[in-house]
């Protein structure tokens, strides 16, 4: 990268890392490593690359393909995610997270959210929050592609989330930071960085963590992470956590590392801390710390409802919607306006509480609308791993047809049966299409379409 590193950053890294800083600076001017994470719920044959040691489903790629032109990415077969940040899944790999609640406090664009979604399974719940509404829309799109139907996307200040005291089994704060770990990938990260931005970030990180702490149940794990290197936002904030909450923190089981990974460990009190430096690991700059809240008996707090959000479906409509999913007895269907949403029975009550107290952007699975007694399916239903694909035909299409479909262009109707079909590429559903005689109505959402090939 031609743009030089900020001088103050260079000086601070030399003070913090000594001679090792020069190797970091060299690495920050090399090409970033390309990596993805496979969706284990969608058994697609994609990318047989080198495995990422700390990520069961992570893969390195030898070069960066045009991901936009891969229909399987649009179908949620994998998520494009740099390797270092996938380590949060490794920190939770020994936890029995099925049916548990996870809060991803600063979730957009959703890479870590989809890790947590995978870990808790279809009977678990992930609340993915971001304070920026436009970012939550992108977050919701990525959650829909991943297709597990177990995420609630919210757009709230941390203080609003904090009202759900002792609610979550895992609380993850991937905090807004000065972004030093992005210096290799993004030129604007270098231009926007200033010493004062670090001060602003530290203050904001502490505010968010104070609210996040309230939501963590006794015995639950707290994960704090940044994509920056400096010890003020990383170790400094962890030391603050120990000062504020140390009496109620304890260490988790020691996290075992392979020396070949190059991860730098530096524990602080109850926290196990991990630094990822791009001159040591195959990944970008990242920091994460983990500890457990002491297991004292404190009752869960459910905020009082502010409003009613859901309406009940008529029995005949429930019957119509139910046959579109593979486990209808395990799901509850509710109305928001004229849109039917599906939720696993294990979490539907929790989602009702959340929806009545928070600003929910998306939740569960948007199934569609009832029109003349029939479900007109919505796009997320096609991507849902629990979609009953025997209800309508599933048609495997060519790459050219798949790309035309994703552009909302016309494709040959002769390959589809009359009525609604699922369009599939590489064994992965990418959306619905409706054949009407000799033509097809492309049902791919306009706001998701590929603009340029």
Label every model-predicted segment:
Residues 98-108:
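Conserved class I S-adenosyl-L-methionine
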Residues 228-342, 347-348, 431:
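C-terminal catalytic and target-recognition region of SAM-dependent MTase-like enzymes
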Residues 129-166:
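S-adenosyl-L-methionine
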Residues 120-121, 216-218:
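Helix-to-beta-strand junctions that scaffold the AdoMet/dcAdoMet cofactor pocket
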Residues 97-100, 160-172:
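A short acidic, Gly/Pro-enriched loop at the edge of an enzyme's catalytic core
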Residues 109-122:
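Conserved SAM-binding loop of SAM-dependent methyltransferases across substrates and taxa
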Residues 1-43, 294-453:
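Polybasic, low-complexity RNA-engagement segments
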Residues 134, 169-210, 227-235, 256, ...:
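Mobile active-site "lid"/loop adjacent to the S-adenosyl-L-methionine
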